[in-house]
Every structure is written in C-alpha cells, then in structure tokens.
C-alpha cells in the first residue's frame, strides 16, 4: 500500500495489525493522519504510547488515540496518565455495540444516541480539521 500512487485529495483509511510493526516499516513515508486504538489495560496503553511516539514522526497531520471500552474512572485515569498530552477520544463500554453487531447493523444506524457512538462522533472532525 505504501508504494501506491494515490491521487491528491484522496482519503485512504487502512486498518493495520495491532502493535507497532507497520509503523516501524514506514521508513521516510509520511501519512496525513493517524488513529491509534487501544484498550485501557496496562499493556495495551504501553503499546499505544509507543505507537503514538513512532506515528508522530510519520504524520504531517493529526494523531488521535481512541481509548476503547473504558469502563470506569480507574480506566479513564490510566488512559489520561499514560497518554498525557495526546489527543484522546474516550469510548465507553457500551452494550449497544455488540447488540448492533448481533443484528448485523452498524452501531451508528442501530443506536445513534448510544454513549459509544456519541463519543466517536467527533473523531472525523479531529482528523480533517487540520
């Protein structure tokens, strides 16, 4: 994908494997924006912090971290402590997400007012406003 000739103004969204492997193989390639997704566990937050540090060197635009499945204040505090100074979107654990999946529906269609969908609603503007 990194070798493709992609027209200016084209949005490409890629979902890469977990971890930092893809980021370490970028070489001198710059990307327009990076979203790092993490759970609020110690190991996952550590990897997210390392991924963000590497991604910062390769992005010419925003770097946003999505902390997924946040259950409580302890999770929120762990995210804030580990990722201090980063742009973070906290997405709460939300039964509407697996419910929509079981119904073979997008959460945005099935439960547009659910806490997780509302938390993610501002992500696009964080990515394209720069």
Where are these regions (language model features)?
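C-terminal boundary of histidine-terminating zinc-finger modules
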Residues: 101-118
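C-terminal alpha-helix
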Residues: 119-130
């Amino acid at each position: 994908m990194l070798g493709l000739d992609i027209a200016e103004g084209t949005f490409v969204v890629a979902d890469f494997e977990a971890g930092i492997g893809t980021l370490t193989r970028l070489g001198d390639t710059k990307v327009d924006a990076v979203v790092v997704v993490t759970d609020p566990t110690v190991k996952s937050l550590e990897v997210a912090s390392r991924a963000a540090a590497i991604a910062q060197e390769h992005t010419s635009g925003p770097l946003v971290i999505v902390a997924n499945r946040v259950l409580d204040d302890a999770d929120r505090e762990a995210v804030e402590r580990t990722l201090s100074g980063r742009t973070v979107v906290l997405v709460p654990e939300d039964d509407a997400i697996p419910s929509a999946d079981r119904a073979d529906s997008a959460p945005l269609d099935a439960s547009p007012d659910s806490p997780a969908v509302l938390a993610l609603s501002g992500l696009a503007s964080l990515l394209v406003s720069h």
